[in-house]
């Protein structure tokens, strides 16, 4: 199957720090891929690139058959303008560590705002979809609440519903439970398990929740110093890792949990 996402020899530096080092990998449509590894190994940078928030210094990223940061002019590729980037962003949505809800909008409007103003959906259609999604994440009774009236776990569930309301090809999840206590984190991870079962969406997830990664992933990528050092189905990578660095990382995560 042709890859929906392709990184081809992608490099990224911040000053003298190499964040991504000649990185190449692909993700198939509908695949659930989890990125694990120590902090600073480039995982979040990959998600930010797919949202066009960070540009690579080297290499090419392709999304849905089109170069992400370049556009075609005849037979040549030139740096992408804002119009191209805006069109490419419609393929992806991201749920961040912090919830980033609009504090002055009620829950329902937080979910309908982008579909109406970005996708151009009629308000009635956007609201019907939002009600359905908020029901799915267990918040049907909170439509008129403001974010400040919700727990952290509830706010993150609104953020998940908001992301799905955009009907993305790719759902990006960046440490979505890192700001939550264990009980609230478990609620959010249960919602994401339902998303993985219910929606035909490609998922790239950065997490330190190894049980969740095992449950939902088709493939797990272990990162270290801007490179993938191990790639395998979750049963293989967690039960029989081949790289010593992977073994040390998994031991450290288990010790912290």
What are these regions, as identified by a protein language model?
Residues 3-234:
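ABC family nucleotide-binding domain
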Residues 235-257:
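C-terminal boundary and immediately downstream tail of ABC-type ATPase nucleotide-binding domains
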């Amino acid at each position: 199957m042709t890859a929906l996402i392709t990184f081809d020899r992608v490099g990224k530096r911040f000053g003298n720090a190499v964040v991504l080092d000649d990185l190449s990998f692909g993700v198939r449509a509908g695949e659930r891929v989890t990125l694990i590894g120590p902090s600073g190994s480039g995982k979040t940078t990959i998600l930010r690139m797919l949202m066009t928030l960070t540009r690579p210094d080297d290499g090419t990223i392709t999304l849905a058959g089109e170069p992400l940061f370049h556009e075609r002019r005849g037979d040549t590729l030139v740096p992408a303008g804002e119009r191209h980037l805006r069109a490419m962003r419609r393929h992806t949505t991201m749920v961040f560590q912090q919830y980033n809800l609009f504090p002055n909008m009620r829950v329902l409007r937080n979910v309908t705002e982008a579909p109406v103003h970005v996708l151009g959906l009629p308000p009635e259609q956007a609201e019907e979809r939002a009600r359905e999604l908020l029901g799915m994440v267990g918040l049907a009774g909170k439509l008129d609440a403001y974010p400040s009236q919700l727990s952290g776990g509830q706010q993150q569930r609104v953020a998940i519903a908001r992301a799905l309301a955009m009907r993305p090809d790719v759902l990006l999840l960046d440490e979505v439970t890192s700001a939550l206590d264990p009980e609230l984190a478990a609620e959010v991870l249960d919602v994401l398990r339902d998303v993985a079962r219910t929606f035909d969406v490609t998922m790239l997830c950065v997490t330190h929740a190894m049980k969740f990664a095992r449950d939902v992933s088709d493939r797990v990528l272990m990162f270290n110093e801007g490179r993938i050092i191990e790639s395998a189905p979750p049963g293989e990578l967690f039960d029989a890792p081949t790289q010593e660095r992977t073994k040390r990382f998994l031991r450290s995560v288990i010790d912290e949990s």
